[in-house]
Amino acid sequence: MNSSPLIVVMGVSGSGKSTIGEALAARLGVRFDDADALHPASNVAKMASGMALTDDDRMPWLALVGAELAAATGGLVIACSALKRVYREAILAAAPSTRFVFLDGSRTLLESRVRHREGHFMPASLLDSQLATLEPLTPHEPGVRVSLDDHPTVESVVRTLVALLTPQVE
């Protein structure tokens, strides 16, 4: 595997982007960041109040995500929703060697996870909005999809990802 992989762990709220991203980064021996920390205060306030972000809200944030990936030395795994293809294209414009990991799960599983999560600014009420916005990763995009329903543990997801990503990041 490439010793400096650039990986975006993507999906809707509750998919486990941060948890899986941290575990994957540890397995690969690279740094982990959460793109939520790059949101401007106005985006955080908007989401915390139950309002969905617009594309205009997201584009400056995605530019920061892409810049962080482009500047990374030694590899980086970053958790970022990257719900639409145009968002992923914005990231790829800044960091073309980025690979995406799409954490896909049933609405029932995702809702359960969101409702049991504490201390996050994203309310469960926005899950439907995110699912409506989601454009799943396509075969023409650089990355892989993992079903959370088929892989119920973090270890199972990470093991599967390492196996799937190895040929892509070498």
Question: Can you describe what each PLM-predicted range is?
Answer:
Residues 22-67:
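Conserved substrate/cofactor phosphate-moiety recognition/catalytic segment
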Residues 12:
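P-loop (Walker A) phosphate-binding loop of NTP-binding proteins
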Residues 6:
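Walker A (P-loop) ATP-phosphate-binding motif of ABC ATPase nucleotide-binding domains
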Residues 17:
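Conserved lysine of the Walker
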Residues 9:
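Hydrophobic anchor at the beta1->P-loop junction of P-loop NTPases
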Residues 94-114:
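Conserved phosphate-donor/acceptor-positioning beta-strand/loop module used by diverse small-molecule
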